[in-house]
Amino acid sequence: MNISPTPKRYSSARSNRNENNIPSMYSDPLYNDNMNQGGGIGHLGGPRNIGNVPTEKIVPEEYRLNSQMINRLIKQNKELNNKLNSKQDEINRLNSLVGSLRAKLIKYTELNKKLNSDLQNFQNSEIINNSITEDVNDYIQVPKKRSVTLGTSPDSMSTPTILKNSHPVDEKINKLNDKLDKLTNLVLEEKSSQSTTSNKSTTPPVTSQPNLFFSKGPSDEDIMVKESVELKNLEDQIDSLKRKLLIKRENELRKISLNQELLELMDKLNLQNPSNAQQNFNNFDISPPLSRSNNESPEYCLECHNRHTSHSQSHNNHNISNKQQNSQYHHQHQKESYLKKPDLPISNPLDTPTPLNKRPT
C-alpha cells in the first residue's frame, strides 16, 4: 500500500489533542471549545468564557481613545484641506479682479491727468485774454455818461465820493506818464547825438513816433534793453576803430623796419663792392615815402640845391671832380636825413616801440 511517510505533517496544529490523544501545548482552547460545542469556524454565538478566560480579545482603553482621536484628526484635516482649496480658488479669483481693476485705474489716472492739463491750459488762456482786455481798458479810457442826478438816491450819493477820490490818482498817474515820456525822449536824443558823432555810418536809434511806442508807458525792462543795445553798438564801433588804428600802426612800424633792413643790405653791398658802390647808390632812390609832391621834384634837397646854385653862379668853370664831390655830398646828406629817428605819435605806451636805426659802419 502506498502510505504517506509523514502523516503527522498534515495533522491539525489547532486540534486539542495529538495522535496519542494527549492535549497539545499549542492548541487553541477557544477553537477547540467551539468545535466541541458544535460551533465551528462559522459559529455566531456570543462571547463565551471558558473558565476565567474571556472569549473576546482584550484591547486597552488608551488604544481605543488614540484611534478615535486619530480618526477625528484625519477627518478634521480633510475638512481643513477642503477649506484651504476653496480659499485658494477665491484668492486666484480675487487676483484676477485686482489685475483688471489696476489696469482700469491706470487708464483713468492718465485720463484724469490729461483732462487736468487741458483744464489748466484753458484757464491760462482765459487769464491771458482777461489780462489783455484789462490792459486795453486801462489804457483806453472812455468817459462814461451818468444820467443819474446827484441827491436822488443813496447810490447817487455814493458816486461823487468815488469820483472825487479817483481824480487825484488819475492826475498823478498822468503826471508820472508825462515825466516818463520826457525822460525817455531826452535819453533817446542824447544817445542818438552820441552815436552820430562817434560814427556817421551807423544807423541812429529809432526816435520817430516816441509817443506811439511809449503811449502805454514803457517798462523798466524795455528801457534797460534799449540802453544795453545802444551801448553794445557803441562798443562795437570803438572796437572797430581801435582795430583800424592798431593795423595802421603795425603797418607803419613794418614799413620802417623794412626800410631799415634795406639800408643795412645796401651798406653790406657797399662794403663788399666798393668799386660799384657809388654807381648803385646813385641809381637807388632812398627818399622816404610821401616826401615827393604831386609834381616831379629834383632828387636833391633845398640846401644842396641852394649850395649848388650859389656855387655855380660864383664859379662858372668847374671841373668834373668838383661835380662829383657835390653829388657825393648831396647823397650823403639825404642818407643822413632819412636815417634820423622818425617821430611817430605814441598814444599807448604799452605798444611795441619802434626799432632803432643802426648807423652805417
Swiss-Prot record:
Subcellular location, record wording: Nucleus; Cytoplasm, Cytoskeleton, Microtubule organizing center, Spindle pole body
Any one of the GO CC terms: cytoplasm
Compositionally biased residues, Polar residues: 12-24
Region: Disordered, residue numbers: 1-24, 189-219, 308-361
Residue ranges the record marks as coiled coil: 61-125, 169-270
Positions with biased composition (Basic and acidic residues): 334-343
Pfam families, per the entry: Spc42p (PF11544)
UniProt keyword list: Coiled coil, Cytoplasm, Cytoskeleton, Nucleus
GO molecular function: structural constituent of cytoskeleton
BP GO terms, sorted: spindle pole body duplication
Biased composition annotated in UniProt, kind: Low complexity: 193-208, 311-328
Domain of life: Eukaryota
InterPro entries: Spc42
Similarity annotation: Belongs to the SPC42 family.
Functional summary from the UniProt entry: Forms a polymeric layer at the periphery of the spindle pole body (SPB) central plaque which has an essential function during SPB duplication and may facilitate attachment of the SPB to the nuclear membrane.
Full protein name: Spindle pole body component SPC42
Organism, scientific name: Vanderwaltozyma polyspora (strain ATCC 22028 / DSM 70294 / BCRC 21397 / CBS 2163 / NBRC 10782 / NRRL Y-8283 / UCD 57-17)
